[in-house]
């Protein structure tokens, strides 16, 4: 008979197939809470996919609403703008709640139980990602705090990744990809973003021949995202001066 942990993992997979990601999160939170053992690679990937989909839907909604708000403001439609702001704040409350949920799990359990280099980097990168998602819409002191926490988590992950993971390792590449996006989109540092992306790409290219078959697809997919972002960023830097909301970076490797 399956243990409660195995049952919840199975239910999380079912929820993923049914695209019921909120329930997938609930099942994986039960797995995390079930014991003090480190999650398996399959379990941590399921947790990541669950949260990525739940947060991804709201991030997309927020971007759409913010774009409409900007257009209505430029037209002087004050009544519409007031309605949009109220609606946007509802989405922001959901985003905050989701981010706080996974950040609590990471700090209280997951980072502390991580025993290997790749799992430590995986969870610290995840911590950086969810603080970055907060920094996307927070303002003032809250945005500053979220950005500082993002930078701290990504730097901690980078230190471990550079010492313990190969330049072609998908988790190390994914970290560099998202770290570069943070520099570009949150810190408004296109030069640092491009330098980080180019360095990670070049280091991986130099060792491409050592890639095992199992990680070749993941690693080369992320390397393509580096290329896409660098193309987008360099064209944005040349076109600077427009007030439009820029196309979001292609970043954030797919789990």
Swiss-Prot record:
**GO BP of this protein:** protein localization; signal transduction
Entry's SMART domains? 14_3_3
What SUPFAM superfamilies would the database entry show? 14-3-3 protein
The record's InterPro entries line, in alphabetical order, gives: 14-3-3, 14-3-3_CS, 14-3-3_dom_sf, 14-3-3_domain
**Which domain of life does this protein belong to?**
Eukaryota
List the GO cellular component terms.
cytoplasm
Concerning its family, UniProt says: Belongs to the 14-3-3 family.
Known PANTHER family for this protein? 14-3-3 PROTEIN
Put simply, this protein is called 14-3-3-like protein A
Source species: Nicotiana tabacum (Common tobacco)
């Amino acid at each position: 008979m399956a243990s409660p942990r195995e049952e919840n993992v199975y239910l999380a997979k079912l929820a993923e197939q049914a695209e019921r990601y909120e329930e997938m999160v609930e099942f994986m939170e039960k797995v995390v809470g079930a014991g003090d053992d480190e999650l398996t690679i399959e379990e941590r990937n399921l947790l990541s996919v669950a949260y990525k989909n739940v947060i991804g839907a709201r991030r997309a909604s927020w971007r759409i609403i913010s774009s409409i708000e900007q257009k209505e403001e430029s037209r002087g439609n004050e009544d519409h703008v007031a309605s949009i702001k109220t609606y946007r704040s509802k989405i922001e409350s959901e985003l905050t709640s989701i981010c706080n949920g996974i950040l609590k799990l990471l700090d209280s359990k997951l980072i502390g139980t991580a025993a290997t280099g790749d799992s430590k980097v995986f969870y610290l990168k995840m911590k950086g990602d969810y603080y970055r998602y907060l920094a996307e819409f927070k303002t003032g002191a809250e945005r500053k705090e979220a950005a500082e926490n993002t930078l701290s988590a990504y730097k901690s992950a980078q230190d471990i990744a550079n010492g313990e993971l190969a330049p072609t390792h998908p988790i190390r590449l994914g970290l560099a990809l998202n770290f570069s996006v943070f520099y570009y989109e949150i810190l408004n540092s296109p030069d640092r973003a491009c330098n980080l992306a180019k360095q990670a790409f070049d280091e991986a290219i130099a060792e491409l021949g050592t890639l095992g078959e199992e990680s070749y697809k993941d690693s080369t997919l992320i390397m393509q995202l580096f290329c896409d972002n660098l193309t987008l960023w360099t064209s944005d830097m040349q076109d600077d001066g427009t007030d439009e909301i820029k196309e979001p970076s292609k970043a954030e490797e797919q789990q």
